[in-house]
Regions:
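Structural/interface elements that position substrates and couple domains in central-metabolism enzymes
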Residues: 1-226
Length: 226
């Protein structure tokens, strides 16, 4: 049975906007896990997130898997709106602007990872989430923007068999690894992609390649009930 709340227009608007901004903050925290594990090593962000999802009912399992940044037309817009309101009401703090800065910075860090492999870049998944065509607020486009700022053109949703490229799996897809040219690098944001070829590199974002946990994780796919 759906829960129905009766209230004023102002309460209704606040419910909608704070719902979206809360989810933005939660996604930012989840993605911070992979930013940290990318640097400290010996850690798989999916393992950490899975524990948080299941060990504490306060955290909850939805929107708690590190991956691409928060996106869509509503969440960024509502964060910007509440940032403006926080300033207008002289609250003295602005969590909402910080969430937007985190979103931007996480996209820039991901662009650095793609560029570091020294190959042409393709992003698989242009829309802001799987199963839709809408690109408003797409985190993939934000990553592509930072790549372009640093002098690297990005292609979308096409596997080129003729040259080695770095592919970002922005959506949880599983292309046949025979499609990739020799020497290609696959950066998987969801840490679920496995391949059988020795002449391509699969990089689980947030897991350092030299760590033993990286090898173990590749042979024990994570579970996700989100």
């Amino acid at each position: 049975t759906p829960h129905i709340t009766c209230g004023t227009w102002e309460e209704a608007e606040c419910i909608k906007i704070f719902h979206n901004t809360y989810l933005s903050a939660k996604v930012s925290i989840a993605n911070m896990i992979q930013d940290v594990t990318q640097r400290i090593g010996h850690a798989n962000p999916s393992t950490i997130a899975e524990s948080l999802r299941h060990a504490d009912r306060v955290v909850g399992h939805r929107y708690m898997e590190p991956g691409m940044g928060d996106g869509g037309p509503c969440h960024p817009r509502d964060n910007i709106a509440l940032s403006w309101l926080a300033d207008k009401l002289n609250l003295g703090y602005d969590l909402f602007a910080d969430v937007m800065r985190i979103r931007e910075r996480q996209a820039e860090l991901l662009s650095d990872e793609l560029i570091a492999h020294g190959l042409p870049i393709t992003i698989m998944g242009r829309a802001f989430k799987p199963g839709v065509e809408l690109t408003d607020g797409s985190p993939s486009l934000l990553v592509a923007h930072y790549c372009a700022v640093k002098g690297h053109t990005v292609q979308f949703d096409h596997i080129d068999r003729s040259e080695a490229r770095t592919y970002l799996l922005a959506h949880p897809v599983a292309p046949d690894d025979t499609q990739f040219a020799k020497g290609s690098v696959i950066v998987d944001m969801h840490r679920t992609y496995h391949g059988d070829r020795a002449d391509i590199t699969i990089k689980w974002y947030g897991v350092r390649d030299e760590d033993p946990v990286s090898h173990n994780a590749r042979h024990h796919p994570k579970t996700n009930d989100a």
